């Protein structure tokens, strides 16, 4: 039987239900007032759900300490039939002792196939990855979503994390969020070298934003083409680091190995990327010709007209692309830059979804008109979102009127969002 506790629904409704009959249990306690006593009662109730196969439990922002984790873990450890587990434990006070209690749970859950574990903003250090070592017992695990962002993880912690992942031989989908920690060159490279051993991965999402990554942190992968032959979807977030053109060159070399990618998402916002870096990146991405979804975010870098031109070459090369999301805000594209990477879109015959964020680029009235002319040729697009705010464009002026008229001629358009606010 399925049971779902909705928003402010009393937790007692769960306590009074037929606990042994639950197979699918959804407990979102985000809006609940939870103290240690309620954690104790919740744990007692969960321990009676012996037939449970799927559990979603959201306890974020509840100030759970090691005592609370002791109660909770003692209940979870008895749920031997679980195949899917989502534990949202972010923004707590979980320390090394709490992690030890939680680790004991995964030594017993042999049937787990899918695990989402959020430990965002706790007190986790490099000594606390025993939890992933415990996951070695979960050999049926296919999907892992692990969030340890906003903790105190350094290079040693990243290395330990990577080493633990190598034991999960059946992983096909991995989402790893280690953003806002203290991971530098060695940690990132050790983590990358370990991921290379996860040869069955089909979907990989890695968030390393807000760390100490520089140009040397583009992974220690030596045989990526062979190791990631099955990879179809790749998402990398290196925003708010210290990456320049040299780092982008290393990233390009890595990406050139993934010739079978269908989905590529890159976030490099707030780094030190310039026109040379973009040219190098585009050159290496020419080997990736199977991409249907492409998302690139390069806001607050040092990109000019040449970057826009090179990105247009990349777009032109992706003949199978159906979705494009491009964020180039806070750069120096100017009116010509805004036009150049749009003018090639008419060659992307399969493109149906287009999102362009171009705010703060000195595009001006001329750029807006040129943009409209280019878009009017993209008759196949059904969803369009364009942000041209803060570009010296009069939102009640001629340029905006022309742009709107041009877009209205896109006959297949279903949804459109145009933003001009200055």
Each predicted region: which residue ranges?
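N-terminal cationic leader/targeting segments used for protein routing and processing
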Residues: 8-9, 36, 63, 81-82, ...
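Concave beta-strand-loop units of leucine-rich repeat
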Residues: 27-34, 56-63, 86-93, 117-123, ...
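Ser/Thr/Pro-rich low-complexity tandem-repeat tracts
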Residues: 43-44, 73-74, 84, 103-104, ...
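Intrinsically disordered, low-complexity linker/propeptide segments enriched in Ser/Thr/Gly/Pro
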Residues: 8, 13, 22-39, 69, ...
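C-terminal capping region of solenoid repeat domains
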Residues: 224, 230-231, 235, 241, ...
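N-terminal adaptor-interaction module of cullin-RING ubiquitin ligase components
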Residues: 1-63, 67-71, 83-91, 113-118, ...
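Leucine-rich repeat
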Residues: 6-16, 18-24, 35-45, 47-54, 65-75, 77-84, 95-114, ...
